[in-house]
């Protein structure tokens, strides 16, 4: 029964559902749900509308007070106050100088307009708030200007800035060394260098590290806000500072509107590179410097940017439709670009493969090196320092020091005896003091190097030593008293296998060649003064005049030869740019006259001059070839000057007296002037020796003459002022004793590392007052890392600079520097700086738009251009003093230092901190900055490391 009943229920239920769906359709369920939702939603809407209406009625009732209305006096007063415009008088005087106040007022106006007014006027039309802000800014500027007038800025600009820059460079140099030492196999990234930089900074500064401010934008903004608030506290009246709203507005304008954009611009590497190029815009980039930069570049991005630009220029040149003379120019340009592209590709492949080639090691393994004679080494500062290092390693330093000491003794003795003979000619009273001092100096040299007590002792023949001792005891000393022994010592150093022969097989010799720029790849040469192949006798190489052999007529006195440089030009041959001189030659005899032109480079003149001065020694004192020039050697004015000098050289050479005095000279002259390609008789090495070493040799030989002439110039002036030559001789005699009684000692390392302190902590007291000497010593030490070099070289450089400055200018440079600082801080220059700031941020009175980021390729090419400019302006004289390789490394180090935004920010903040410490010396700004930087992570690590190293020592106690 139950089963039948359940079946009946299911049956009727199914039938009902089917009928329901047939009647209302299959979507009736969705409609039903929709109807229910609409019903519920409608009820809620009605409820909300009812509540809203009742709420509005209640609020309207609450707005009206139930108290009786007051009189109309208060509303009337409020209306009167609104109608009265409160006038605020603002004194527009800021610094007391109208030329400064006017642009400053414009800066204030533009700042308020672009940072405050554009949003303030949407809130209120009341001008009083804006006037209060303006008054607050003016009060701060007035206090700032007043304080600036009371400060002596000379120590800051001549001492503090130089110390800060030198210290920054030292930290960067040590960071570079530390990154290199960490792992030679894996090249450190820029992030590693920045992190290591701040590690070194905290080790050097001890109590401050600026890593957070320089690497975290959030912390940097907080630092600037705190700094601006401190400045406002010092500059604003107490009433204005207590107004938080006003103070915060001014703080934000200064921090985010002025200081932060300025710091961003000054620390941008691309901006610095463009500024460097602009600063030396007058110097022309030469081919050799450009190719050296590509060869030395380790940045693939730079090489790719140059390669892509070369490919773009190639495509453009190949698309040109040219004919005639232009086709040769286009072909030369295409060849040059192809060569640059090839060098870039080769360098990129080498960097990507990781197979970096050490030029010094490669040259050492190759075995075929230039031979530098010993006499050239002894007169060249750069070469001598390497030979000195080697002699110290082999125990032969006594021989070298003896040779150097005797050279110095000879020059000084000649000078002293010249003074003495001058007194005899003038009939003045004689004194034996000078001879006594010379005898004492000679005896001192004998005791130091040659006596049995000498240690180490110079080993020479005993009879020479005995002869010298007898001369010292019985005769007056002469400048040549040590010549025989010095000659023997020279031969010993030259022939003994321990010394010069072994030095040529040592790695120091290869490094010496690198510093002398004698390991250079010849494929990268080419300039006006280059040593490449001589240019053909004619520009096209196809013009050949049918001339008889000029040398066949040398014996004919009736033949007259005249030549002059008629024109100059700049040529480009396979990427090498050089100057070409067109020489017009006239040959006359009894019956005929012939004329032709030949073309020569400066290197041809140089080679020709070397050949004839070697063959005819008397010409070396008569003929003077115009010297080389490092940069601007393609400048039109320079080429005209050189043309004039070379013309004078030719006219002197072709004088009849000169030709008759040296009949064989005519053969060389005719060969040089003949219309054919000049065959150089000297090799590349010989010309380098003539350029780099021989002038120094000649200068060493002429030191005696230069010193002899001293009493007629500088010393004579001193004598006229003091009228006491005896005192001057006594002082010079004391210098002899101090110079020659002892072997030049090496500077020993102290227990405290001098590298872990600021650069100013290592200067001598007598250097501190000499501003130019101080600046040059700091820059030479830190840029070129002279502390790692031979200390004899460093002392020589210091003495050279010191004597040059003091003897030539005295206090003149100091006065000029002080006057220049006064000029920089004068109202005119301050006004000019404010105007430049105004024009940079608001050109034509309109806020400057954000400069779009320059393309990476453009920035990379700017880097190449900047380095090329720096290389091009480096004088050869600097390379002669400290070495070519050291000069290149120093330039690249300084340039690389400015390629890191974080490190540039650090330098800007260091300069800012020094400026504020100078401006407010009575306040403890140093402690304030230490506190603001106290959250540095590197500082915390350093303190933990310091505590961990000090803990064991404390436990032992």
UniProtKB/Swiss-Prot annotation:
Residues 373-511 form the RGS domain. One of its GO terms (biological process) is intracellular protein transport. This is Sorting nexin-13. Coiled coil: none annotated. Residues 559-680 form the PX domain. Residues 97-284 form the PXA domain. Keywords: Endosome, Lipid-binding, Membrane, Protein transport, Signal transduction inhibitor, Transport. It comes from Mus musculus.
């Amino acid at each position: 029964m139950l089963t039948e009943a359940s079946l009946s229920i299911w049956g009727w239920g199914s039938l009902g559902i089917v009928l329901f769906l047939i009647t209302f359709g299959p979507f009736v369920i969705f409609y039903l749900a929709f109807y229910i939702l609409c019903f519920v939603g409608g009820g809620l809407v009605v409820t909300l509308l009812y509540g809203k209406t009742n709420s509005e009625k209640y609020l309207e009732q609450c707005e009206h007070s139930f108290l009786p209305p007051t009189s109309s006096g208060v509303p009337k007063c409020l209306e009167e106050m609104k109608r009265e415009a409160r006038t605020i008088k603002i004194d527009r005087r800021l610094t007391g100088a109208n030329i400064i106040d006017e642009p400053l007022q414009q800066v204030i106006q533009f700042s308020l307009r672009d940072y405050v007014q554009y949003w303030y006027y949407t809130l209120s039309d009341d001008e009083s708030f804006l006037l209060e802000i303006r008054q607050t800014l003016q009060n701060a500027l007035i206090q700032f200007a007043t304080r600036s007038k009371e400060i002596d800025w000379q120590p800051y600009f001549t001492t503090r800035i130089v110390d800060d820059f030198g210290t920054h460079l030292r930290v960067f140099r040590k960071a570079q060394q530390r990154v290199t030492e960490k792992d030679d196999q894996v090249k450190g990234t820029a992030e590693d260098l920045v992190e290591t930089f701040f590690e070194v900074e905290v080790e050097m500064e001890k109590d401050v590290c600026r890593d957070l401010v320089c690497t975290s934008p959030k912390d940097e903004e907080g630092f600037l806000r705190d700094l601006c608030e401190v400045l406002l506290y010092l500059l604003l009246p107490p009433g204005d500072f207590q107004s938080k709203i006003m103070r915060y507005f001014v703080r934000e304008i200064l921090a985010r509107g002025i200081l932060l954009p300025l710091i961003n611009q000054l620390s941008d590497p691309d901006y610095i590179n463009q500024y460097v190029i602009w600063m030396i815009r007058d110097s022309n980039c030469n081919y050799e410097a450009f190719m050296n930069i590509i060869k030395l570049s380790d940045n693939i991005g730079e090489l790719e940017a140059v390669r892509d630009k070369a490919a773009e220029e190639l495509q453009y040149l190949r698309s040109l439709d040219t004919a005639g003379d232009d086709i040769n120019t286009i072909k030369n340009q295409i060849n040059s670009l192809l060569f640059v592209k090839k060098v870039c590709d080769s360098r990129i492949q080498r960097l990507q493969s990781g197979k970096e080639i050490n030029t010094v090691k490669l040259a050492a393994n190759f075995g075929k090196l230039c031979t530098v004679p010993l006499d050239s080494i002894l007169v060249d500062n750069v070469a001598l320092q390497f030979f000195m290092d080697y002699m110290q390693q082999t125990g032969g330093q006594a021989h070298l020091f003896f040779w150097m000491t005797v050279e110095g003794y000879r020059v000084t003795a000649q000078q002293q005896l010249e003074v003495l003979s001058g007194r005899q000619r003038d009939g003045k009273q004689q004194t034996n003091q000078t001879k006594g001092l010379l005898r004492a100096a000679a005896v001192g040299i004998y005791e130091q190097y040659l006596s049995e007590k000498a240690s180490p002792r110079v080993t020479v023949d005993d009879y020479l030593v005995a002869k010298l001792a007898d001369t010292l005891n019985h005769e007056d000393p002469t400048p040549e008293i040590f010549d025989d022994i010095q000659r023997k010592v020279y031969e010993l150093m030259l022939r003994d296998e321990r010394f010069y022969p072994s030095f040529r097989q040592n790695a120091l010799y290869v490094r010496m060649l690198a510093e002398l720029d004698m390991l250079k790849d010849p494929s990268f040469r080419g300039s006006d003064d280059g040593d490449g192949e001589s240019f053909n006798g004619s520009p096209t190489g196809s013009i050949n005049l049918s001339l008889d052999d000029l040398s066949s007529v040398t014996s004919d006195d009736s033949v007259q030869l005249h030549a002059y440089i008629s024109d100059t030009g700049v040529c480009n041959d396979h990427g090498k740019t050089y100057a070409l001189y067109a020489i017009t030659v006239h040959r006359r005899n009894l019956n005929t006259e012939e004329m032709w032109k030949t073309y020569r480079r400066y290197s041809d003149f140089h080679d020709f001059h070397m050949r004839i001065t070697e063959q005819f020694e008397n010409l070396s004192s008569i003929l003077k070839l115009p010297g080389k020039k490092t940069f601007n050697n393609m400048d039109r004015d320079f080429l005209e000057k050189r043309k004039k000098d070379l013309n004078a050289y030719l006219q002197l050479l072709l004088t009849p007296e000169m030709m008759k005095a040296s009949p064989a000279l005519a053969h060389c002259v005719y060969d040089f002037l003949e219309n054919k390609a000049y065959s150089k008789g000297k090799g590349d090495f010989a010309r380098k020796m003539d350029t780099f070493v021989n002038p120094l040799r000649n200068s060493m030989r002429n030191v005696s003459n230069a010193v002899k002439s001293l009493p007629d110039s500088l010393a004579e002036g001193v004598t006229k002022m003091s009228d006491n030559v005896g005192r001057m001789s006594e002082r010079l005699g004391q210098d002899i004793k101090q110079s020659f009684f002892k072997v030049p000692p090496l500077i020993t390392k102290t227990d405290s590392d001098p590298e872990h302190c600021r650069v100013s902590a290592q200067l001598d007291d007598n250097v501190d007052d000499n501003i130019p000497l101080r600046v040059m010593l700091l820059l030479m030490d830190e840029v070129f890392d002279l502390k790692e070099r031979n200390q004899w070289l460093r002392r020589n450089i210091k003495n050279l600079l010191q004597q040059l400055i003091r003897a030539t200018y005295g206090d003149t440079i100091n006065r000029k520097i002080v006057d220049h600082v006064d000029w920089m801080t004068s109202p005119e220059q301050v006004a000019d700086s404010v105007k430049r700031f105004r024009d940079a941020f608001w050109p034509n009175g309109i806020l400057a738009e954000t400069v779009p980021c320059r393309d990476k390729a453009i920035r990379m090419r700017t880097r190449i251009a900047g380095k090329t400019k720096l290389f091009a302006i480096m004088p050869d004289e600097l390379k002669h003093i400290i070495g070519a390789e050291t000069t290149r490394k120093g330039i690249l180090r300084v340039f690389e230092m400015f390629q890191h935004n974080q490190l540039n920010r650090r330098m800007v903040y260091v300069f800012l901190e020094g400026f504020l410490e100078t401006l407010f010396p009575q306040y403890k700004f140093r402690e304030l900055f230490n506190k603001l930087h106290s959250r540095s992570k590197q500082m915390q690590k350093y303190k933990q490391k310091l505590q961990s190293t000090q803990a064991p020592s404390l436990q032992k106690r």
